[in-house]
Amino acid sequence: FSAFVFKIQANMNKAHRDRIAFMRICSGEFEAGMNVYHVQGGKEIRLSQPQQMMASERKMITKAYGGDIIGVFDPGIFSIGDTLTTSKEKFAYEGIPTFAPEHFARVRQVDTMKRKQFVKGINQIAQEGAIQIFQEYNTGMEEIIVGVVGVLQFDVLKYRLNNEYNVEIRLENLPYEYIRWIENEDVDMDHLSGTSDMKKIKDLKDRPLLLFAHEWSIRMTEERNKGLILSEFGRS
């Protein structure tokens, strides 16, 4: 048996604050309650209460087969692109490409007393793949930068944080239009030579990235740092 997680949805039932991980079965047969190895988590887990969904209806299932899509309760351990398997030879499916956001904003909660709800909410929404969140290099979660493909996603973020987590936010638009993932594993961010319109950031997995306001800055940064490999797409 093998499967990969392609979608996560939080608060499908607001009364229970549930979180469902949707996975596609790639091979073998699934049985409710079976134990599988979560490759990215590095441990064996039990998949209980599997469901299939049609619109707002949920149906508990006992078996599923290759090609089927099932939803399982996620206590916060899954991420998009995760592999689950019963194979003795551990492997991982290639991650799902992450499209480069084109709009960026610094996000803060209006009520400082709701910091915990804010961090929880924005992390859960990011784990669904609806937005991407970043931190400035060498800072903590105090400064959060959100990246989206379309500006309407900022409105969706505002609504969901307010409606689902009771958190009001303030957005400060940033001038950056381009983002690049750094492929080099041994890059020294402190000594990376860039341009005045470049910002060093990191994602939730502490992977280094660069933001640019102008396209020419990307080429100049590559020229100033021989061997630097920049990618327009990341992987979940």
Model-derived regions, located:
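Conserved nucleotide-binding/hydrolysis modules and their immediate coupling elements
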Residues: F1-A105, V119-K120, N138-T139, E143-I145, ...
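Intrinsically disordered or highly flexible coil/loop and linker segments, enriched in small
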Residues: K14-A15, I131-Q132, R170, I218
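A common structural junction motif
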Residues: G41-E44, K88-Y93, I125-A130, L161-R170
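Conserved structured catalytic cores and adjacent interaction surfaces
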Residues: A64, A105, Q132-D188, D197
